[in-house]
Design a protein with these regions (language model features):
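C-terminal segment of classical bacterial N-terminal signal peptides
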Residues: 1-5
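Active-site-adjacent loops and short helices of periplasmic peptidoglycan-processing enzymes
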Residues: 6-174
Length: 176
């Protein structure tokens, strides 16, 4: 006998201890759920948020090399005092979306996250006329939540593009 959460559909025993708070393991070849531990409990996604930021940006910018973004003082100030991981992008620095995506993923740059979210959210606000009067970043976060739902995430809600703590920013191991 073993806990139901440790049993796969094929009835085998998982023989290991875990130190993490939540796990969801699934055999992608068979669809068999192999192991779960608090798989549906809310957890903070932290910097794994940037995976969805990357996806939303890459799906909404056609020319990643030819499209550029620039860090503004306002965007830099939005990260002040947060203890953010940054890519050390300087105010006024212009780079391609491709370069900004690298700054987002390699050093986990929150400065890159807000630049990208501001750009993509701003373009979406222009396309829609922004009837809800959302900020560019709030529009981008709405796009992230729409994408998460499209991917089948039912226990996930994003509040920002960078993963900084917010009560309304959460996911589950099953969704991740």
């Amino acid at each position: 006998a073993f806990p139901a959460s440790a049993a796969g559909d094929e009835g085998f025993t998982i023989d290991f201890e875990t130190n993490c708070n939540a796990i969801f393991m699934k055999n992608l070849d068979t669809g068999t759920v192999v192991f779960t531990k608090n798989a549906d409990e809310r957890i903070e996604p932290a910097s794994t948020t940037k995976i969805l930021t990357y996806i939303v940006v890459s799906e909404n910018v056609e020319d990643l090399d030819g499209t550029t973004v620039t860090l503004t003082q306002e965007l830099k100030d939005s990260l002040e005092g947060t203890g953010s991981s940054i890519a050390n992008i300087m105010v006024g620095e212009t780079m391609s979306i491709y370069e900004a995506l690298n700054c987002l993923m390699v050093p986990s740059g929150n400065d890159a996250a807000v630049i990208l979210a501001d750009y993509v959210g701003g373009r979406k606000n222009q396309e829609t006329g922004n009837p809800e009067k959302l900020s560019n970043i709030d529009r981008f976060v709405q796009m992230m939540n729409d994408k998460a739902a499209e991917l089948g995430c039912t226990g996930t809600h994003f509040a920002n593009p960078d993963g900084l703590h917010d009560e309304n920013h959460y996911t589950t191991a099953r969704d991740m």
